[in-house]
Amino acid sequence: MATEGMILTNHDHQIRVGVLTVSDSCFRNLAEDRSGINLKDLVQDPSLLGGTISAYKIVPDEIEEIKETLIDWCDEKELNLILTTGGTGFAPRDVTPEKFPTFPFCGLQKGATKEVIEREAPGMALAMLMGSLNVTPLGMLSRPVCGIRGKTLIINLPGSKKGSQECFQFILPALPHAIDLLRDAIVKVKEVHDELEDLPSPPPPLSPPPTTSPHKQTEDKGVQCEEEEEEKKDSGVASTEDSSSSHITAAALAAKIPDSIISRGVQVLPRDTASLSTTPSESPRAQATSRLSTASCPTPKQIRRPDESKGVASRVGSLKVQSRCSSKENILRASHSAVDITKVARRHRMSPFPLTSMDKAFITVLEMTPVLGTEIINYRDGMGRVLAQDVYAKDNLPPFPASVKDGYAVRAADGPGDRFIIGESQAGEQPTQTVMPGQVMRVTTGAPIPCGADAVVQVEDTELIRESDDGTEELEVRILVQARPGQDIRPIGHDIKRGECVLAKGTHMGPSEIGLLATVGVTEVEVNKFPVVAVMSTGNELLNPEDDLLPGKIRDSNRSTLLATIQEHGYPTINLGIVGDNPDDLLNALNEGISRADVIITSGGVSMGEKDYLKQVLDIDLHAQIHFGRVFMKPGLPTTFATLDIDGVRKIIFALPGNPVSAVVTCNLFVVPALRKMQGILDPRPTIIKARLSCDVKLDPRPEYHRCILTWHHQEPLPWAQSTGNQMSSRLMSMRSANGLLMLPPKTEQYVELHKGEVVDVMVIGRL
């Protein structure tokens, strides 16, 4: 049997995706599932698809297990998109798309995907094959199948990490619109179709070369950059693309597809492909990206953030699209820092940044942080979102007089006595008979009240007098109590009246609010956008968690912790990786974060070390406004906060200390409240409660945020706060199980410690 599927949720994304890895070796734990894990990252990247991983599973190359999983994810979990990776080659056990015949001359048999799908999507399979063939001739050995089952799109991707990523990018521009079509998202589909109608038809070439084949013409479409097109218009001469530009990637297709289609599907140019050279050391993918560009027009570097509304300018700051191409010179200039690292002896011995009080720093962060714009989402994706509009009921609830209890609909004026039963009214049905004097009708909870009745008597206040011979019907019942008019009946509009405001602008939605939207039939709502957060760690000493330790190296924990902290609050994240202590690398990484995210979080490189260049890069290269560079607090003294305003769009930058505990504490103190404000929460401040100390605590000259575990004792109104032990800022163990931060005052001559049982303020940072 297959390994147990891992179900993940992220309520903030609209496209629910399942990733299915088909591999005997991965299933038996003989190999790592690099392809599946990479696809999950690509799906969740807000600058690409911006989807939610709702299901993930590894199965062996067994056709029945593949089919069982696909059917379950389509019919039961109702996913929007399923990506399979593996089993698409020529090997005997490659049965994901279709199975080879067991005996000669018996014809091609259906495999897992072909047996499951109801309609094929051959265009997507063709796009993957064409793109793969431009990368390697071995692409012809792939047998992908794409198709539809119900409202779910199923895509077969290759088994390798590289191949699956490339094929995912080839089809990415069309995925959001395809899913909108399957979900019958009428508004979004109409917007796209309207934009397609508005697109001008390309003029025919003035004198096409006689050797130009239809295939070549297909490759040429959409490749020219806008600047070159403008030059051609001015000169009145039309030309075709050079034959070397034959690899049509997602980015190239995006140049001719409406933004509403590609808002979640633009290929992002990796940092290491900015150069146009195609040396043998480059990967085939990098070479293919370079071949897309002409000598004067490199691959577009701009991206659009997910769900950007039609006509709204890209929020990419200085990289805002002014033209679809930048020169090689501009790209190289942007990649070099102006920070001088040669004069080590002249570096600062004392920080040039004044100490800022915690209160002032916190107020500054909230004052400088903007509230993001709005977007329209499906109500199912509203968990954790903030409404940007009032929501009104369009119908009464209940829309008919409804019974509150199981019993009998009666005429109150009849009083107690024996009554004939004329039928029944059940929930979901409208009774057609009228209750006359001396009659009653049996009703269930929630059922409509029949005409003529004006009260309900619960079944407990009745006695059955007569039934049918076979016991299947009640014929006569005795009413034992006097009913009053309106008794146990919910009148029309009793719960919600038509036109009533059921949810106000600024409401932070939870499960009840989602249910209320469903109740009133409001399936699309306007909400504030979620901020996209990019996270990176800095330091030459850092290794990825999966790497073996080397002399002088440590594993990077900050990035994982910060990403998890942000994701715990539901915000989409971008992993920028580890960046070395080099101004050029820092500048490139920051530029990438600025182009893809609303908020950039870094850890390390902000203290007084000779390799701490981050503040200089922010100041000298990016011309960011550094609002504070030191905070009078423990831990987190070198915490830095900066903003960057480009073309009317503000980017927020938090440069956090490199010590693990300092990074987590300052993230909770500054970053999380800022993100809450950006998404429109009216009071973004953290929750602070009172608690009693479980032990004596010595005070520090600085205000301290001491990690603790909050627990409640029986019949005591206040929780007790237990210290997590050694509070050294490098000791991440002090954060283990911590759900609160003791907000300790600075030491004075009168107070050098707080004693057990004293009441202190505690900031809640975890589940209680």
Swiss-Prot record:
Q: Residue spans with biased composition (Pro residues)?
A: 200-212
Reaction it catalyzes: molybdopterin + ATP + H(+) = adenylyl-molybdopterin + diphosphate; adenylyl-molybdopterin + molybdate = Mo-molybdopterin + AMP + H(+)
Q: What does the PTM comment of the record read? A: Phosphorylated.
Q: Which GO terms describe its molecular function?
A: ATP binding; identical protein binding; metal ion binding; molecular adaptor activity; molybdopterin adenylyltransferase activity; molybdopterin cofactor binding; molybdopterin molybdotransferase activity; nitrate reductase activity
Q: Does the keyword Membrane apply?
A: yes
Say if the entry is tagged with keyword Transmembrane helix.
no
**Segments for region (MPT Mo-transferase):** 14-166
- Recorded protein name is Gephyrin
Corresponding gene?
A: Gphn
